Regions:
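Interhelical loop/hinge segments that connect adjacent transmembrane helices in multipass membrane
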Residues: 1-4, 116, 176-182, 192-235, ...
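Signature of the first transmembrane helix
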Residues: 3-62, 92-100, 127, 219-248, ...
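Membrane-interface junctions at transmembrane-helix termini in multi-pass inner-membrane proteins
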Residues: 5, 130-156, 339-370, 410-412
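Transmembrane helical elements of multi-pass membrane transporters/channels
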Residues: 7-23, 182-194, 198, 211-281, ...
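Helix-loop junctions and terminal segments of transmembrane helices
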Residues: 57-72, 143, 257-299, 352-357
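Interfacial segments at transmembrane-helix termini and the short loops linking adjacent helices
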Residues: 105-124, 313-343, 349
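Hydrophobic alpha-helical transmembrane segments
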Residues: 153-200, 220, 370-374, 388-409, ...
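Membrane-proximal transmembrane or re-entrant/amphipathic helices at the cytosolic face
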Residues: 438-483
Length: 483
């Protein structure tokens, strides 16, 4: 875990820096510099692109991580890398042709509701294509155990560029329409930068020769395409369906709550960059003992780190909403439901890496397809009835079923589970800390209240976590940097 913790810590710092910039954009710059309708438009375009890009990538970013270490010669590795580069291009061209022929249908789809979206529909394809290749080249760097630069580009670069663009809009240098086009170009430039970095780590010899186990690779890519897309679909489906049932500004309002809750997932995202290829390597070498140890320790470490973030969000949410325009404020219940989803995700440790790099990914595929349909039905029923609260409830139910399914699959097939008695103690402590501080408000400015409450909660949490040794890996990291 030493290398994992070291790179994960660097990635977590980078990711939180990016999320800090994103928080300023999401909570303040977008809400004050753009009209609600255009903020909702931006949120919709990015959510729709997130639904599309996994299909363009055709799962090859996961395929690369799984199969790369199984090849022993440079020639075979180069054949795999060439396939990884060409396959998404072919799929994207096919999807582009379908998009061209169905463009008039898409325009008619938006006639009945949010017509503001119509001129920008084609940008979804460009953003999705750029994101697909960015993820492929990011995986390229991860198989070389270099994830820090890619993580910076994934979490910081585009948010920093958006900050600059928003200020250009504020100072009337850019119109809102050109801002949206410029934002699209940011994603294209990010993909190009990631490609140059990946090639600097390892540039294959280009050939049209195909890897020897082509059928296995293609079958895995096709299946993992759906299985690996489930989390993305479950995450962004609600926002896309909100746009269909409610005025588009509701996408922005709901998106703020989603972004706040997503901060909890930062430790998991940071650790995943390095733990994913390592898990694949352990599975390829059949090292079950190390795999089991990694499963438990990653779960406990992620829970310890993400739990304090969960507490800070919930106890400060009312004060935080006082800092943004009234029209963007929503029920605390929505943030709580979405935050619980993210906390549960962290508790699973490296379960996704175990499943997607094992021979049991077909089972995940089956559950994923079923749960995507269930999530669609949940949103179909709950959004018209409860509005954005219904979207949050649908996401909570869908992710709860999905995560429990993954836990049961790993328990059944690998005879291991990530939880210990410490997991229960941490959850009880977190629940008590949250309830104790949620109703305690200081009579000061919201920023001062947030700072005071955050300091008190953090100090109490760190003292208890270190005293009772919630996670040995976290304790070692704290001692190292404390010195």
């Amino acid at each position: 875990m030493g290398v994992i913790i070291k790179q994960s810590f660097k990635n977590m710092i980078t990711t939180y820096f990016g999320f800090g910039i994103g928080a300023v954009n999401t909570l303040f710059l977008f809400t004050y510099f753009l009209e609600k309708e255009y903020y909702g438009l931006v949120s919709f375009l990015l959510s729709a692109a997130n639904l599309v890009w996994p299909f363009m990538a055709f799962g090859v970013h996961n395929t690369l991580v799984k199969f790369y270490t199984s090849y022993k010669t440079k020639e075979e590795k180069d054949k795999l890398l060439n396939l990884i580069l060409l396959l998404p291009l072919g799929v994207s061209i096919l999807m582009g042709m379908i998009g061209v022929y169905s463009y008039s249908w898409l325009l008619n789809y938006f006639d009945a509701g949010n017509e503001l979206v119509k001129p920008y529909i084609w940008l979804i394809f460009i953003i999705a294509f750029a994101t697909a290749y960015f993820e492929i080249f990011f995986a390229w760097s991860k198989i070389n155990y270099q994830s820090v630069f890619g993580n910076f580009m994934k979490e910081v670069f585009h948010r920093l560029c958006v900050t600059i663009l928003l200020f250009l809009v504020y100072f009337s240098v850019l119109s809102v329409e050109y801002f949206i086009y410029a934002m699209m170009m940011v994603f294209v430039l990010r993909a190009i930068a990631m490609q140059l970095y990946a090639f600097s780590l390892y540039k294959p010899s280009f050939t049209l020769a195909l890897p020897t186990n082509l059928n296995t690779v293609l079958k895995y890519s096709a299946l993992i395409l759906i299985a690996g897309s489930v989390a993305t679909i479950l995450l962004d489906l609600d926002k896309v369906m909100i746009e269909h049932y409610l005025p588009i500004e509701n996408v922005a309002i709901y998106g703020i709550a989603v972004y706040i809750a997503t901060v909890i997932s930062v430790p998991q995202k940071a650790m995943h960059q390095i733990i994913h290829p390592l898990t694949a390597s352990l599975l390829n070498s059949s090292d079950k003992s190390s795999l089991k140890d990694l499963y438990k320790r990653s779960s406990l470490t992620l829970l310890v780190v993400s739990a304090i973030i969960f507490v800070l969000i919930i106890v400060n949410i009312n004060e935080l909403y006082k800092l943004i325009p009234v029209e963007y404020q929503i029920s605390t219940t929505i943030v709580l439901l979405l935050s619980l989803v993210k906390l549960f995700d962290n508790m699973l440790g490296n379960v996704n890496s175990v499943l997607f790099n094992s021979d049991y990914y077909r089972i995940v595929l089956l559950f994923g397809v079923v749960l995507s349909i269930v999530a669609f039905v949940f949103n179909l029923i709950l959004i018209p009835k409860f509005g954005i609260l219904g979207a949050a409830l649908a996401s909570f139910l869908a992710f709860a079923v999905y995560n429990i399914s993954k836990l049961l699959i790993v328990l059944n097939k690998f005879k291991m589970q990530p939880f210990t008695l410490d997991t229960f103690y941490i959850l009880m402590f977190v629940a008590g800390l949250t309830v104790s501080f949620y109703f305690w408000e200081f009579p000061f400015h919201p920023i001062i209240n947030i700072a005071l409450k955050s300091i008190l909660v953090t100090v109490i949490y760190i003292v208890v976590a270190l005293r009772f040794n919630f996670s040995e890996d976290v304790n070692q990291l704290v001692r190292k940097y404390w010195k």
